[in-house]
A protein has these predicted regions:
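Flexible, compositionally biased loop and terminal segments
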Residues: 1-228
């Protein structure tokens, strides 16, 4: 059984900060450090793509101070981590509606995508920013209408071509933080995913935890609706 595409709902930064008597922005910063470790391990494990939920459409409802801190963290993370990602042959792509973060952040994101572009990356790192699965499906329906695509011509390929999500399917979805819900993430792409819910808060999630999730995946049986 192959494991090519992994997605992670990186939940628990705020609770981790509160537990450690730190500011929320410090929790998010520690979350970036955790992601850095998982990216390295994904390369080591020959994973083809890692798709992470960084900021949802619902997250715009958070306090302005927190959104601003996340905005600054995005820019600083690109400045500090991009060269190392390129050295690891990691291709970075952001998806979702992140225009509200402002021109500076938008331009920094495009710079990161262009500079890390590769036709043969060791890992595709997809970052969901201002993304929601329901809105993605709504936008797909609008595009189908705008392009006047016949109902008989709509298939899985059509949906994947019109979706914002770079990957057509996810093999393994991991959610940290203890909650057992999908939270509007990759609703179409996780149709046959193995889903692992992890109690640890995201900043505490390590490469050892990641390896355990990978091993658990290989010990499962994916039937895709078939009888064995």
């Amino acid at each position: 059984m192959n494991l090519k595409n992994i997605a992670i709902i990186m939940d628990g930064n705020g609770r981790w900060a509160k537990k450690n008597n730190l500011k929320i922005k410090e929790g998010h910063a520690r979350g970036v450090s955790a992601l850095k470790e998982i990216v390295k391990e994904s390369v080591n494990q020959n994973i083809e793509s890692l798709t992470v939920y960084a900021f949802s459409t619902e997250n715009w409802k958070r306090p302005k101070s927190e959104v601003k801190a996340i905005n600054n963290l995005i820019v600083n993370s690109i400045n500090n981590e991009l060269d190392e990602l390129i050295e690891q042959k990691v291709k970075v792509r952001f998806f979702g509606d992140y225009s509200n973060f402002g021109k500076k952040t938008y331009e920094k994101i495009k710079f990161a995508e262009e500079k890390s572009f590769s036709n043969e990356p060791k890992l595709r790192l997809n970052v969901a920013l201002g993304y929601g699965g329901k809105m993605d499906i709504i936008n797909i329906a609008r595009e189908v209408s705008r392009l006047k695509i016949k109902a008989s011509d709509i298939n899985d390929h059509t949906i994947n071509e019109l979706s914002q999500v770079p990957e057509s399917s996810i093999d393994l979805l991991i959610r940290t933080g203890g909650d057992t819900r999908i939270s509007n993430f990759l609703l179409y792409q996780i149709a046959y995913s193995e889903i692992h819910f992890v109690r640890k808060l995201w900043p505490d999630y390590s490469k050892q935890d990641f390896k355990r999730n990978i091993n658990k995946y290989f010990n499962s049986e994916r039937r895709f609706g078939e009888r064995t």
